[in-house]
């Protein structure tokens, strides 16, 4: 049947090292989104929404955050074969890269 192009949707929950403010976490998320070509927007106190367009695909995420943690939650997608809790593997790669950049931004001297 060939290689599976879908995988379970990864829900990312990351802990933030102590000594950060919610504002610094927000800034790290927005910067990481910009670095990875996500369109980020504030969706209320402690919540950022992100959208990534790649050719004819798109993914929408919701990132609740605080001074101590953040999550990257799947909201919706277009042309990413999403069904039954599974999605195209690219989605998981995109959100893991975003998470990695958020962590890097948080580890940089403020």
Locations of regions flagged by a protein language model:
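Ser/Thr-rich, low-complexity intrinsically disordered terminal regions
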Residues: 4-110
């Amino acid at each position: 049947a060939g290689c599976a192009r879908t995988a379970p949707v990864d829900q990312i929950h990351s802990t933030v090292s102590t000594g950060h403010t919610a504002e610094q976490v927000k800034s790290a998320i927005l910067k990481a989104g910009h670095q990875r070509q996500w369109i980020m927007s504030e969706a209320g106190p402690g919540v950022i929404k992100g959208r990534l367009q790649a050719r004819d695909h798109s993914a929408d995420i919701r990132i609740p955050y605080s001074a101590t943690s953040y999550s990257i939650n799947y909201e919706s997608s277009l042309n990413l074969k999403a069904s039954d809790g599974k999605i195209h593997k690219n989605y998981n790669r995109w959100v893991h890269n975003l998470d990695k950049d958020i962590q890097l931004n948080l580890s940089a001297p403020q």
